[in-house]
Amino acid sequence: AVIMCVSDGEKILLGRQATWPEKRWSLLAGFIEPGESPEQTVVREVWEESGVKVGHVRYVASQPWPMPMGLMLGFEAYAPEQPIAISDELQAACWYSREQLRGLIASGDLLLPDALSISRSLIMRWLDAGPQDRVFWHTEAGKGGQP
């Protein structure tokens, strides 16, 4: 399975499922289909769940995942902020700036995944990133990519 931190460098895409605890938000995730690379899965799953087109994708980390006894592969993916068209898999999805996300977390209006989850780790990695960490997403042409 894959889980992805989708960002334009300044905003992050988070979603929530109706079955989750109230106020819980997380990253989008999905299962790899036969014949598909993990990177292709990231692009497909983000599109299917949110209608957002992803550009560059890079692997970050993995975590053993108990259901269905597998491995969760964590990715970062570039996508310029764009309108969201949620699928029936999600109750809601939204782009959040670092300032917005910090405020919602501090007020208790948004709950992150459990502290030991790869989802939480990827969100905090993005939230704590400084300008030097965001260079990856900017090119001379103004589109996402590696310098």
Regions picked out by a protein language model, each given a short descriptive name:
Residues E49-G51:
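Peripheral (non-transmembrane) domains and long loops of multi-pass membrane proteins
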